[in-house]
Amino acid sequence: MDQEQILEKVLEVVRADTHGAASLTLFALMKTMSTDNGQYLFLLNKLRDISPDMRELAYGLMELMAQGRNQAESWNRTLADIESAIRNG
């Protein structure tokens, strides 16, 4: 999947179940990786709580961060949409 597909799929997962384990885990991972000067502290054992398909999305998000794409406008826009969905969900 490319960047847009990964971000769109994550947003789709969150909108489908705003307070589900996968939604909140993916949101926490994205939020953690959004601070460029942060240390990206995330409890990887949380990945055990989600399905293999959702872990694939998490790995995709990690790859985007490794490529420096976690500072892109599309990342920030998706994160804002996710925050809004969770807040209003």
Residue ranges of model-derived segments:
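Short, hydrophobic/amphipathic alpha-helical patches that form generic packing surfaces
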Residues: 25-36, 60
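Amphipathic alpha-helical interface segments used for dimerization/assembly
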Residues: 10-14, 34, 62
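Helix-boundary capping/turn motifs
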Residues: 1-6, 32-36, 53-54
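Short terminal alpha-helical segments
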Residues: 1-29
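Short, charged early-sequence alpha-helical segments and their helix-coil boundaries
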Residues: 40-67, 73-77
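Low-complexity intrinsically disordered segments
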Residues: 69-89
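Positions within ordered alpha-helical repeat solenoids
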Residues: 16, 32-35, 67
